[in-house]
Amino acid sequence: MNRKKLLISLAMVMLSMAGLAADNLPALRVQGKNLMDANGKTVVLHGVMDTPNRYFNNWRWQAWKADYTDADVKPCLDYFEKIFTAITDHSQGAYCDVFRLHMDPCWVAGTESLNSGYMSYYENNGHETTGEANITKFYLPYYRKYLQSLYIPLIKQALAHGLYVVVRPPGVCPPKLTVEEYNNSATKRKCYLYYLLNIWHEFASDPYIQEHSGQISIELANEPISITWNGSSDNGAMKEFFQPVVTRIRRDGFNGIIWVPGTTWQQNYRDYVKHPIVDSQNNLGYAVHCYPGWYSSGSGNNDNTNKEKFYNAFLDAVPVAKTNPIIVTEIDWSPYKPGSGHKDEQGNWVESNYGTWGTATTSGFGEGWKYIHDKLGNISMTLQGSGLYFDIDTYLKDKVVEPAFKGVDEACGEACFKWCKEWYLKQNTTGIKQLETQADVVSTLYYNIEGKEVEKPTAGVYIIKQLLSNGKIRSRKVFLK
């Protein structure tokens, strides 16, 4: 067998074994206050978050059903394949490079007969916590099943499109958490901390997740409101609560980046300065949320955000930004929409915005946020939803990628569509980019997004893998028209 045939044969073996993501995305890790790629270059990420849930996906991939079963996995995966294709379509101006995945609890909730054994939590009014903050119906065998058949396949799809992935646990934190719940033998195996330990043990132990820990990161929890220890919240309570989870994840073999949340819906990180979490890998950042009206920013009709005041308040609440990388995993804004709204319980007219959690303007809150982002230089971000970055319905109908709320300059869609491209291109000389070589190409193979070789590619998205004369393999995503 001559050298060329030998190289091609070796390439075929390697292509069948190698994951698409590892070849396309340099591994990331924490270096001081920054994210660094495998080439020692500073990186910040920008993209969207989303959740595999019919309701939150506006019934686009399936109509209402009473439950979620194996039969529902494929239409869900097919839908997100389109989302990932759209938000990474550079030819149409889309430049996302990170996706925050919510392992939605709708897939892992059992019936009464499958009660998880986890305890109920209660609101200040004495009512039992409901919805995503209620873990009493969590069923571990379902989580194990859909981790393999849905959540990890979604991660693989995202990686294949050049998206780093931040993974969040199912649901949201109950309103009042305490360290004592875990330290008390009567509640240890029933409390929310034990729930997180189980979730992340299954996730961090998975061989695929471990293999791609440079591209996949973990956000420990979503929006803790209150965490206390011995009745206090500023005595190391956050550290005592999350330290066991970090320690367990590392013991299970996951060495990738862990994003630690703060309290007050991910606004308060002050106590971590005095009581930092210890990480054996020194690969720790902080996951923050930022909405209009927070951190002394403006909102509503009074969005007179002062950039410097916003910046100072943000840094006061998130002082860990001086020492560690930050990812803002939820942010959005849009102004009031003329003529839209509803009447409240008292019959007063309440104006509505264009469909975001926060009401504000780009010229106020948005520009203030960009000022913080650019000044600190170590903040990544994901918009609160895919549909806040681009118009999903237009894309599904016409394959056209355009900003969400097109034409509304004061909404986050137009602004972030522009900024993500700006940030990506600026970073392309110092951050994420495909490592190229001028070595001669021995052979080129085309693979579809599912990883199957295509002999005669037509129009669409493909991963090309090229065997070089120096024995190396390089790969990249291409759009064929």
Where do the model's predicted regions map?
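An active-site-proximal structural segment forming one wall of the substrate-binding cleft
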Residues: 28, 68-98, 103, 107-217, ...
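Non-catalytic accessory regions flanking glycosidase/transglycosidase catalytic cores in CAZymes
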Residues: 2-3, 7-9, 14, 19-95, ...
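Extracellular glycoside hydrolase catalytic/binding regions
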Residues: 27-28, 52, 56-76, 179-217, ...
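C-terminal outer-membrane/trafficking sorting elements
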Residues: 430-481
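Short amphipathic alpha-helices and their capping/turn segments at secondary-structure boundaries
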Residues: 36-39, 80-93, 154-156, 206, ...
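Short capping micro-motif at the N-terminus of alpha-helices
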Residues: 37, 44-46, 352, 456, ...
